[in-house]
Amino acid sequence: MLAYLQGEAGMLRVKKALEDAKKGSSQVTMCVINLGEVLYIIERERGLVKAHEVLAAIQQLPIEILPVENQTVFNAAHIKANHAVSYADAFAIACAQENRATILTGDKEFETVETLVKVEWLKQV
């Protein structure tokens, strides 16, 4: 999501996924924990007003924000305990597993979990 919002490498692939979701030919999901991660990064870098603007923009996109149930927390904790990933990334992995989803990312941290979840690598420039 940050690649898309900040015009980084991989933005076009994320844009295509969102266009496909708008047409109904695919689904884009995001764990609420990862939405929080995006918002804190935006607020830290650009301020609270910008974070609110980004939240409003994300809410207009064809993205289903997934709530976090207790079992998801337990699954994310297990992933974090056994893999060198951030806590927020553990939630992305757990949500992707639960929904049989593919993670779009350029974050090399996900190399260690490719046996757990399908990863589509965004091009890095």
Q: Each predicted region: which residue ranges?
A:
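Alpha-helix capping/helix-boundary segments
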Residues: 1, 34, 72, 92, ...
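Short, well-structured N-terminal submotif of metal-dependent ribonuclease cores
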Residues: 1-30, 43-56, 125
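Amphipathic alpha-helical segments within well-ordered protein domains
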Residues: 2, 36-39, 77
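Anion (oxyanion) recognition and catalysis
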Residues: 22, 59, 97
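Conserved beta-strand segments of alpha/beta enzyme cores
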Residues: 27, 64, 117-120
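Helix-loop "lid/cap" segments that line or gate small-molecule binding pockets
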Residues: 41-44, 62
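Active-site neighborhoods of divalent-metal-dependent phosphate/nucleic-acid chemistry enzymes
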Residues: 64-104
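Acidic, PIN/NYN-like endoribonuclease modules and their adjacent C-terminal/linker elements
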Residues: 93-125
